[in-house]
Amino acid sequence: TVPLVIEKIFKSSVFPTIRKPMVKSIMKIPGLASVIYKQIRKKLLHAFGGRIRTIVIGGAAINQEVEDLMKAVKLPYTVGYGMTECGPLLSYEDTRKFVKGSCGKPVHRMSLRIDSDDPRAIVGEIQARGDNVMLGYYKNPEATAAAFTKDGWLRTGDLGLMDKDNNFFIKGRSKNLIIGANGQNIYPEEIEDKLNNQ
């Protein structure tokens, strides 16, 4: 599902209730937060037809507050990452092993790397190679040449990090990156996420 659908459900049905001052106070009492989360889960399951095996999210980054709540109410979800040029899935992880905030690990027969001196700490472009990667753009050798590195990796245009377990974390788009006056990297996607949580 596209995150906007999930976010719309949470923002219209769940957040108005849990943001009420009385509910916020009750959730601070030990043991009561879990009772409220169970009720939220029950209502969400009912809204989705009574049973959810897995919610697979893709197409855009998920709002952090929505993801936190999905985790808290124990909805089985995962986030996949892909693009048309890669047929389309690049990374995914089973819900039982999924790391919050990530888009999973490279799928079978695909390799991902971060074009960075330190892919765990310094954001770089996510690059892909594997059986599902396109050969090139139809009748457009210039675009094809620009899309690939000299050693044959597809430039996704997405920026990210990876952890020691090979989970990937998308931070933004290279075309959207703003360099601040002090040299700080500013990702509009992170600002948008914060504004969406207000």
Predicted regions and their residues:
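Generic beta-strand/beta-sheet core signal
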Residues: 1-2, 55-58, 73, 80, ...
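Short polar/acidic secondary-structure junctions
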Residues: 83, 117-119
